[in-house]
Amino acid sequence: MSSLTSVELNFLVFRYLQESGFTHAAFTLGYEAGINKSNIDGNMVPPGALIKFVQKGLQYMEMEANLSNSEVDIDEDFSFFQPLDLISKDVKELQDMLREKKRKERDMEKERDRSKENDKGVEREHEGDRNRAKEKDRHEKQKEREREREKLEREKEREREKIEREKEREREKMEREIFEREKDRLKLEKEREIEREREREKIEREKSHEKQLGDADREMVIDQTDKEIAGDGSTGAEPMDIVMTPTSQTSHIPNSDVRILEGHTSEVCACAWSPSASLLASGSGDATARIWSIPEGSFKAVHTGRNINALILKHAKGKSNEKSKDVTTLDWNGEGTLLATGSCDGQARIWTLNGELISTLSKHKGPIFSLKWNKKGDYLLTGSVDRTAVVWDVKAEEWKQQFEFHSGPTLDVDWRNNVSFATSSTDSMIYLCKIGETRPAKTFTGHQGEVNCVKWDPTGSLLASCSDDSTAKIWNIKQSTFVHDLREHTKEIYTIRWSPTGPGTNNPNKQLTLASASFDSTVKLWDAELGKMLCSFNGHREPVYSLAFSPNGEYIASGSLDKSIHIWSIKEGKIVKTYTGNGGIFEVCWNKEGNKIAACFADNSVCVLDFRM
């Protein structure tokens, strides 16, 4: 018979402490016992292994005590012991207890027999039983009448709630109608203003026709020179290490090209443009998300005195600013018909374009940090502080599978295709998971700090990651080690983005690149194939929290805690537009046309910038 080694026992106790939430005790035992040096595969040890092991031992002692007792008939009922007796006594003491118990049972049986023989009131007892049965029947009928009354009360309450819901729907319908009327009115005003602007521009064009012709000639010469230098799109030239800094010709975005969206009462943590309409979603620490209807075209064509209306998606029934319901992340589905939000209460919510809450998804036991729709739109993926990722079946409004691989909070998730995805965590690990599989399809190890962000390239063959260890890495699904280790940053890298160029994009003939934003105040651009830095954009003075490529891949927008948004020309390697607000910037994003940029600020505002070059 094989025996349990001390190393195996230590590991079982270590796992028990972890599963029971005794984190510090588990850490101490793991350190002193050298758990991390053992060869035991933790994935092969099922949850609750120590408890099952101890229970089996107790059952064995119980069977030994019963079967080894010669005074006990094995055909009789099996006798059970209290767990404390099994732990504190040996087999002989248990057998003595069993014999004593049997003797008492025999004595009690004899006493019952004598009682039956001497009992002369058997008939009276039968009469008492009948009376008790009648009383019980009467009591049951009384309870049935009470249940009927409670059922009627519940039905009345449901009817009252139904009426209240109908009233609430009517109020919401009226608010939506007002919102639509206001939107139509703004659209009409915008069209009129655009027409007037066109007339003015026509006059200006006629006045400066000669000057424009001269400018056009010069632009053609410059463009031709650029093409000759670049080899007209040739890929034969070696990439160069270029460090770019802002120039004195930086163009500050005028106030006429800016709209400040006010309404949130706490810092705005996330924003995202709809992929199908001119709608902007924002999520805030005030326990609300908002859907803003942004006018199309230039802001100059829209009356400056008009506010931009928003639908308010309340995550708390009472007052806002409930910190447990901070909206930390949000994402539109591919069709732009549904918005998903994740919050600090551990719940994901799904909303319609009209601001109607259609699903509340509850499974996590901690705040949700990341949330993504798959391309098909049938699954929603969430990552939480509770160290798990959950795939939700949106149509069924229920969780399909929970993935519990990480030993620390899950910081980011990203779909590779409709059924597989990557997760990253504070435990420095990256896992490739697949729906229906109970173990990771692949494990990527190499980072020495928290992995803040993971992103798949447009083809789903390369995975980029960034970490507090000041590195970004590029991984290939065909191997477990990283393909490129990008080490030019000097501080933590907070986020990364793939360019919308190369295979699998709308710009297939352009080079695929990776951009990274760091606490060292820089944005760096990398050659994805060679793993070499192409250029470093040095213009911010504080950590850079967010960056986004324009849809055509020609520009990068970056947002920093220095309150500034810089828009960089990748071709020229310099800032071409900039805007400074009143708070640190947590996220920036482009609309699908590439003519507007949104940013969310720590001063409770959302900013939308017109961008035209």
From Swiss-Prot:
UniProt region (Disordered), positions on chain: 101-174, 193-214
Keyword field: Nucleus, Repeat, Repressor, Stress response, Transcription, Transcription regulation, WD repeat
Cellular compartments annotated: Nucleus
LisH domain span: 5-37
One GO process term, biological-process aspect: response to cold
Transmembrane segments: none
InterPro entries reported in the protein's UniProt record: Ebi-like (IPR045183), G-protein_beta_WD-40_rep (IPR020472), LisH (IPR006594), WD40/YVTN_repeat-like_dom_sf (IPR015943), WD40_repeat_CS (IPR019775), WD40_repeat_dom_sf (IPR036322), WD40_rpt (IPR001680)
Gene Ontology CC annotations of this record: Cul4-RING E3 ubiquitin ligase complex; nucleus
Null mutant phenotype: No visible phenotype under normal growth conditions, but mutant seedlings are hypersensitive to freezing.
GO MF, one annotated term: double-stranded DNA binding
Function: Acts as a repressor of cold stress-regulated gene expression. Interacts specifically with and promotes deacetylation of histone H4. Plays a role in gene regulation for plant acclimation and tolerance to cold stress.
Protein name: WD40 repeat-containing protein HOS15
Source species of the chain: Arabidopsis thaliana
Gene name of the record: HOS15
